[in-house]
Amino acid sequence: MTHICIDETLISCRNRCHLIIYEPNKPHKYGFLFRIMCDCYTGIILNFFLCDVGINGAETVTMVNACAKLMEWSFHNDIRTTFYTDRGYTSIALLQLALKNKCNFIGTAQANRFQENTLKWEQVDRGKD
């Protein structure tokens, strides 16, 4: 089984190019935004793509579509996979896509993100058997 992490990275650049994105919460504010899929154990990049910015400054590919696009690579190669994502990529649509292709999906779930769907919340008792 393969363990894959999906995340984004901003490669710093201050040139004049329509692909440069402004991210105020990143250490480098301006640069090229890449969505990257890499192996958790080796750190080798398996798949990536450059995010494009539309005319109005919004991304043409949403985070959910970006993650689905990266996940399709492992589905076509028939790899049993566990995907690890951060809070920006976790959604019901991606969970259903992973389930349909018999893959595992681990991500951080925020309570306000899943308002139309109900999730079971269980309190974990620490230190009890």
Predicted segment positions?
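Acidic, contiguous segments within the catalytic cores of piggyBac-derived transposases
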Residues: 1-129
